[in-house]
Amino acid sequence: IRRLLAVWSAHCIKFACQLTGKQGATLAGKAALTLYPPILGELAREVKEDIFVVCGTNGKTTTNNLLASVLEGNHKKVVCNRTGSNMLNGVASAFVLNAGFSGHLKADYACIEVDEASTVKVFPHFQPDYMILTNLFRDQLDRYGEIDTTMELLAKAMGMAPHMKILANADDSLSAFLALEQENPHAFYGISQQVI
C-alpha cells in the first residue's frame, strides 16, 4: 500500500506544481522515495527490455531524448527524464510519473540521463543494461573539483553494474580511457571521417 501511496502522491505533487506554473520534476521523485524507498528499484525491474543511462559533460539531454524518440518511433513505450532532471530525485520522478495509478509501470525501455556524480546514488536502485558516455571535460570543475573526481565516481558506478555495457565516445580520450579501464563489456562510437 505504501507503493501505491508513493505513486499517487507523486502524481498529485506533479499536478499541483503544474497548477502553480512549476515543473515539479524532482519534488515528485523525492516524495515517492521518502514514502517508499524501494520504489525506484521495483519500478525499474518492471521495464521489459533494456535500461539505458546517458552520462557525460555535454550532450546528455540531447542524446537521451534522441534515443527515446527513436525507440518511441518504433512504437515502444519508453520511460525518459526528458527535462534533464538527472539526479536521484529526478530519475525517480521519471519512473514514478510513468507508473499508472495501479502502482505499476508498463514500459519497454528506459532512457535515463544521469549526472555523473549521481550515478553512485542511482545505481544501488537499479543496474542499467547500457551506459552511453558522451564525453568528459573540465567544465564540471565548479561542481566536482578535479576531472579525476568525476572519473572516479563513474568508475565506481560502473563497478556497481558489472554486466552493464559501456558505449563510449572514441573521439574523447577520457571517455575511451575510462571504458577501457573497467571490467565492463564496452564498445565505442565516433566519427570515422574528417568532417571539417
Residue ranges and their predicted role:
Residues 52, 79, 130-132, 167, ...:
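Hydrophobic/aromatic beta-strand patches that form the interior of the parallel beta-sheet core
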Residues 74, 126-127, 181-184:
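Short, structured coil segments at secondary-structure junctions
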Residues 1-53, 72-74, 89-99:
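Short, basic phosphate-binding NTP loop
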Residues 51, 108-111, 165:
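Residue-level preference for the first positions of well-ordered beta-strands
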Residues 37-84, 155:
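Walker A (P-loop) phosphate-binding motif
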Residues 90-133:
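Conserved nucleotide-sensing/catalytic segment adjacent to the nucleotide-binding pocket
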Residues 72-73, 129-138:
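Gly-rich Lys/Arg/Thr-decorated short loops/hinges at beta-loop-alpha junctions or inter-strand turns
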Residues 49, 137-196:
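Acidic, Mg2+-coordinating active-site environments of NTP-dependent enzymes
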